[in-house]
Amino acid sequence: MEQNKIEKMLGKIDFAEFGTLRDYPFLIGLQLGFSMNGGGYAVCDGGKFTVNISKECKWESQTREAAVTASLERVEEILKAAKVNYVSELVGKPVEVTLVNSAFKDFRILTEVL
C-alpha cells in the first residue's frame, strides 16, 4: 500500500474571489489561488470552500443551511486570521499550504508574520 505524500509549502495568496465557479455555476463560495517557491509553483483550492446551491441538489433544508453557514464561518475565520475585512485583501498574504500527493488539501494564514 502506497503512502500519501504530504508536503507543507510556504507561499502567498495569488487570487481571492467570492462567487460562483465559472465551469460549475451551481457552486458558490470562496475561491483561492496560491503561489509557492517564489512563484515557481502554483495551486488552486479546487473549490474546497464552495457550496452546491443548485435547485437540483437534494439537500435536506437544515443540511443545506448548515453547509452555507459553515462555508461563511470559514470565510470569517480566514479574514480574521489575515486581519482583513474583504476577500480582495487576502491577496499577497503569507500562507502555509498543505498538499497531499501534490494536490491542495488545506492552508493556513501565517499569522505569526503578519
Residue map of PLM features:
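Short beta-rich binding modules
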Residues: 1-114
